[in-house]
From Swiss-Prot:
Belongs to the UPF0235 family. It holds the Pfam family DUF167. InterPro entries: DUF167, YggU-like_sf. Gene3D superfamilies: YggU-like (3.30.1200.10). It comes from Paracoccus denitrificans (strain Pd 1222). SUPFAM superfamilies: YggU-like. One of its GO terms (cellular component) is cytoplasm. This is UPF0235 protein Pden_2174.
Length: 82
């Protein structure tokens, strides 16, 4: 698991690129970009819930502190840490 704890400050906005239906769950730091792959399907918010869980673990914050600002139905998402 990629450690992103250095990004976990209140008010920080984190852009991620999501790949649903992947072969495994992972958070990948690719240069400046953060990519999250999840095995779940993008139906009824299941993939978003999996992304929040993985991203919160990588950031070392509670899931409740992550707020999806933009991209609920898109692959490019923007999260804010409260």
């Amino acid at each position: 698991m990629t450690d992103l704890s250095h990004l976990a400050r209140p008010g920080a906005e984190i852009a991620v690129r999501v790949t649903p239906r992947a072969s495994r769950n992972a958070v990948i730091l690719d240069g400046e970009a953060i990519r999250v792959t999840v095995t779940t399907v993008p139906e009824d918010g299941k993939a978003n819930a999996a992304v929040v869980k993985l991203l919160a673990k990588a950031l070392g914050v509670a899931k409740s502190r992550l707020v999806l600002v933009r991209g609920a139905t898109a692959r490019d998402k923007l999260f804010r840490i409260d």
